[in-house]
Swiss-Prot record:
Belongs to the ribose 5-phosphate isomerase family. This is Ribose-5-phosphate isomerase A. It is an enzyme of class 5 (isomerase). InterPro entries: NagB/RpiA_transferase-like, Ribose5P_isomerase_typA_subgr, Ribose5P_isomerase_type_A. The keyword Isomerase applies. Homodimer. One of its GO terms (cellular component) is cytosol. The active site is at residue 116. GO terms for biological process: D-ribose metabolic process; pentose-phosphate shunt, non-oxidative branch. Catalyzes the reversible conversion of ribose-5-phosphate to ribulose 5-phosphate.
Length: 239
């Protein structure tokens, strides 16, 4: 199977497993992630709805990408602050860019990390779907950590991080001149630590956000997710 087939396989398996366990149910409030692994999960939910196996859900998307896909598929969407949602969700499902042995995550490859974190941290259960390439022994040295920043603070933040020996890259747009602009009107920087550095995701999630002008960073350490991992041979781990 190619990568897209593996992503569809793990997404469908996760949705079907959660449905069979009663964790996806009529009238539930569900957060829907962003990216190439999360989209098949949205499609599978749409299939359950169109078949009548699932009658109604209250979906909260984490990005414009997900909102548009839900609209195409006929899934009604809400915000976390909608009266029907009330600020909390039953479950959220999303992909990840890196997963360490403690199930800490790096997310934000799709530049939607701020809303992804708001949704994940306000859900009773958080489910992550990914392929085996996303499992790592340590974080912040392979896949660069995305950080959402206020544009005006770009240079001051860059200098503060570089003073700690951290490499900083302003993410450039594709089919758009200049930097990536998030759904919230901010910039994304991607940062990497030296290979010899001791990267502590839990501590860094807190300390990075204390830098003036940082909106949010892509470490997700505060709620341990249930993780579905698909391997190249098609087998799926439920961690």
């Amino acid at each position: 199977m190619d990568t897209s087939q593996l992503k569809e396989r793990v997404a469908y398996h996760a949705i079907d497993t959660l449905f069979s366990e009663g964790k996806i149910f009529d009238g539930m409030k569900i957060g829907l992630g962003t990216g190439s692994t999360a989209m098949p999960a949205v499609h599978r939910l749409a299939q359950l709805l169109s078949s009548g196996k699932l009658k109604k859900i209250y979906a909260v998307p984490t990005s414009f990408q997900t909102s548009i896909e839900c609209e195409k598929l006929g899934i009604p969407i809400y915000s976390l602050s909608s009266q029907q949602i009330g600020g909390s969700l039953d479950l959220a499902i999303d992909g990840a860019d890196e997963i360490d042995p403690d199930k800490n995550l790096i997310k934000g490859g799709g530049a939607a990390l701020l809303k992804e974190k708001i949704i994940a941290y306000n859900s009773k259960e958080f489910v992550v779907i990914a392929d085996e390439r996303k499992k790592v022994k340590s974080m912040g040295k392979g896949f660069a950590l995305p950080i959402e920043i206020i544009p005006e603070a770009r240079l001051s933040i860059t200098k503060a991080l570089e003073a700690q020996g951290i490499e900083v890259f302003l993410r450039e747009g594709v089919k758009k001149m200049g930097p990536v602009v998030t759904d919230n009107g901010n910039f994304i920087i991607d940062v990497k630590w030296p290979k010899a550095a001791d990267v502590d995701p839990k501590a860094l999630e807190e300390s990075l956000n204390k830098i003036t002008g940082v909106v949010e960073n892509g470490f997700f350490t505060k709620n341990t997710p249930r993780v579905f991992i698909v391997h190249q041979d098609g087998n799926i781990e439920d961690l």
